[in-house]
């Protein structure tokens, strides 16, 4: 699989879209068909256990299958099939948006409690990983690189780690969705402005991080100084880059910067688009 460094997601999203295209086609053209009903069935499981339990279990089983032999590789290795499933689950949410928003609005408490429990479990697994030297979260414990661990495929702890890691990530996503829907789902020029900067900030932050590290490490600064000052410099650098790039339509197109409609352009359609931002 082709890797594009920290822009790995571009290539991955293309592959995911390509592989899932038959499902997209069938659901779009046969919205009452068997596959569409099967996907919508996630929201029909009692007590909202579809998105709360079934989907993260499927993600966990992906880790159980692939994580022992494949280490972490920024979107590849065992993460590739995991993100493919996540992409599919996101699609299920989109095509069943009414059921999705009903779930997000009415499952806020269990989502929050689940996030707390999953986070505590994640901290525990991370602590055990540090103590034992087994890459419970990084994967690859049964691969050639970790033959010295003597793990053929799974132990009780590696199985638990697969479920903890998947549930932790999944519930944090739901946590951000549910509280974002409650606190941020309203017209805001500040949110619209910040939304413009998502892609340019992500695209340019890596070279700025490297530049800061090269200079600061050469100067012999401590890790905490590099972290604190480096974070400030990277944020400022990304912000300056964003402000420069958003001023011309060519650079806006290059970095995925959407224009904010002016007051004259705020038709009902545009108001809806602004709220989506």
Regions picked out by a protein language model, each given a short descriptive name:
Residues 1-277:
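Alpha-helical transmembrane segments and their immediate juxtamembrane cytosolic regions
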């Amino acid at each position: 699989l082709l890797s594009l460094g920290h822009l790995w997601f571009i290539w991955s999203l293309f592959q995911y879209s390509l592989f899932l295209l038959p499902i997209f086609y069938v659901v779009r053209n046969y919205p009452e068909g068997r596959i569409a009903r099967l996907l919508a069935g996630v929201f029909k499981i009692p007590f909202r256990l579809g998105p709360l339990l079934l989907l993260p279990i499927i993600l966990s089983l992906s880790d159980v299958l692939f994580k022992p032999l494949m280490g972490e590789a920024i979107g590849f290795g065992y993460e590739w099939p995991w993100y493919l499933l996540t992409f599919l689950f996101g699609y299920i949410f989109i095509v069943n948006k009414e059921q999705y928003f009903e779930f997000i609005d009415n499952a806020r408490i269990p989502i929050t409690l689940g996030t707390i429990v999953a986070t505590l479990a994640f901290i525990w697994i991370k602590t055990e990983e540090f103590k034992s030297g087994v890459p419970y979260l990084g994967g690859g414990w049964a691969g050639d690189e970790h033959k010295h661990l003597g793990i053929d495929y799974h132990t009780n702890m590696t199985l638990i780690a697969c479920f903890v890691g998947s549930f932790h990530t999944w519930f944090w996503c739901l946590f951000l969705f549910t509280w974002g829907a409650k606190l941020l789902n309203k017209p805001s020029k500040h949110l619209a402005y910040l939304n413009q900067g998502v892609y340019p900030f992500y695209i340019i932050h890596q070279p700025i991080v490297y530049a800061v590290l090269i200079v600061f490490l050469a100067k012999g600064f401590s890790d905490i100084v590099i972290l604190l000052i480096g974070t400030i410099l990277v944020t400022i650098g990304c912000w300056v880059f964003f402000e420069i790039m958003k001023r011309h339509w060519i650079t806006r197109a290059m970095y995925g910067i959407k224009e904010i409609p002016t007051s004259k352009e705020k038709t009902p359609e545009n108001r809806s688009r602004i709220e989506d931002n």
